[in-house]
Amino acid sequence: MTSFSTSAPCSAPDSARRISPEQTNQVRPKLPLLKILQAAGAQGEMFTVKEVMHYLGQYIMVKQLYDQQEQHMVYCGGDLLGELLGRQSFSVKDPSPLYDMLRKNLVTLATAATDAAQTLAIAQEHSMDIPSQDHLKQSVEESSNSRKRTEEGNIPTLPTSQYKCKNSREDEDLVANLTQEETSRLDLGFEEWDVAGLPWWFLGNLRNNYTPRSNGSTDLQTNQDIGTAIVSDTTDDLWFLNESVSEQFGVGKKVEAADPEQTSEEVGKLIDKKVTEVGKNDDLEDPKSISDDTDIEVTSEDEWQCTECKKFNSPSKRYCFRCWALRKDWYSDCSKLTHSLSTSDITAIPEKQESEGVDVPDCRRTVSAPVVRPKDTYVKEESSKHFDPCNSVEFLDLAHSSESQETISSMGEQSDNLFEQRKDTENMEDCQNLLKPCSLCEKRPRNGNIIHGRTGHLVTCFHCARRLKKAGASCPICKKEIQLVIKVFVA
């Protein structure tokens, strides 16, 4: 972007175009540029710089040369504008190709009366390297005033076609009604337009269709020699139009970057929103299917993984909850384990030892008279195996321990037999309960399974169970809400 550079001398045509507004007000476009302006609705052959830029914007709008998604990009390949620019596309953010084209295709009106003044102005520009501060401030104020006046015409929110026509008519009326002094103030040099990028009315027509893609903009400041130019990111659709005049321009003033706290807060809100949306989709299982799971102490380490569908299930479940595959190495399907050291054997030891002479007093236990626990006695008998049989006392202990081991093994076999008998008895009782009639009607067999959560009770017939479900009654056994009733067939 062009800045107030003073390192190189200006050429004669460029200097002629930068003559003060009192001397030159209008320019004459060359024939290729004039065709483009007339295609956009321009009439006549004499225009101001503002009118030329306005009709260029109208031409881009009518031909729809801008990208619908990224509207700052203008694709002019195969068009008269592209042939005039000598390129396929350009960006509004970098309007230097457009400025170069205007410098080559705009001819200022020089009369015999102004030739001497132009020569004097060129000589003064070559002799003065640095523009005065008054000239810079005046240029900035004039640019800001023109923007402020024309900004009021962009406020109404109308449909796109109506907005374009209205905006174009307002611009034409504005140019027609301006006095000679006001018109001269609008005809600023190209370097003065470069202070804030393209003028407002070039993007103003695109503003109705332009969607801002960022909530903030980043201002950069570059120093070239003594003059300072402000380079602004206008992806948020001309944010400077909504700011005050003091915030829009400042030649030689430091521009602060965007507030980092505001940016971090906006990023944090976006992250919280994404986490909330993901959290809503985490629970993919039916909440009714797990509402009756009362085992809250089961951790993920205790769960077993199904070999078919790789789902983790509760350790108390025999079948996979998802695919109903049988759990691998389920204890009911394994070979019978030996119960020589089972719980029943351990409980049988103190009964025998207490009956063999361990006197339990009726008073409280004291420190001087501890009670001999069966577990300690059993550990002593186990450790006596490792003693040397050469010692007579240890040999007697070994003999005693061998006798006690035989007694323990015989008692273990008896307890196993009792356990099997008890288990068979329970199975018979369960079978008899299943063979009993319905607990409600006492006529039909128990084939109605009442399901609640992950458990169920088989105490009624299917007919009575369905009646309970329709009546909204609870399970007659556990008083839980009946969720489902199924019919059971015993093979």
Curated annotation (Swiss-Prot):
It comes from the Eukaryota. One of its GO terms (molecular function) is zinc ion binding. Its main location: nucleus. Residues 394-491 are annotated as: Necessary for interaction with USP2. GO terms for biological process: negative regulation of apoptotic process; protein ubiquitination; regulation of biological quality; regulation of cell cycle. A zinc finger (RING-type) spans 438-479. Residues 131-152 have a biased composition (Basic and acidic residues). Residues 1-25, 131-163 are annotated as: Disordered. Phosphorylated. Phosphorylation at Ser-368 promotes interaction with YWHAG and subsequent ubiquitination and degradation. Phosphorylation at Ser-342 also induces ubiquitination and degradation but to a lower extent. It is found in: Nucleus. GO terms for cellular component: nucleus. PROSITE patterns: SWIB_MDM2, ZF_RANBP2_1, ZF_RANBP2_2, ZF_RING_2. Residues 25-108 form the SWIB/MDM2 domain. It holds the Pfam family Zn_ribbon_RanBP. The modification Phosphoserine is found at S342, S368. Keywords: Metal-binding, Nucleus, Phosphoprotein, Ubl conjugation, Zinc, Zinc-finger. A motif (Nuclear localization signal) lies at residues 443-446. A zinc finger (RanBP2-type) spans 300-329. Belongs to the MDM2/MDM4 family. Inhibits p53/TP53- and TP73/p73-mediated cell cycle arrest and apoptosis by binding its transcriptional activation domain. Inhibits degradation of MDM2. Can reverse MDM2-targeted degradation of TP53 while maintaining suppression of TP53 transactivation and apoptotic functions. Interacts with MDM2, TP53, TP73 and USP2. Found in a trimeric complex with USP2, MDM2 and MDM4. Interacts (phosphorylated) with YWHAG; negatively regulates MDM4 activity toward TP53. This is Protein Mdm4. It comes from Bos taurus (Bovine). The gene is MDM4.
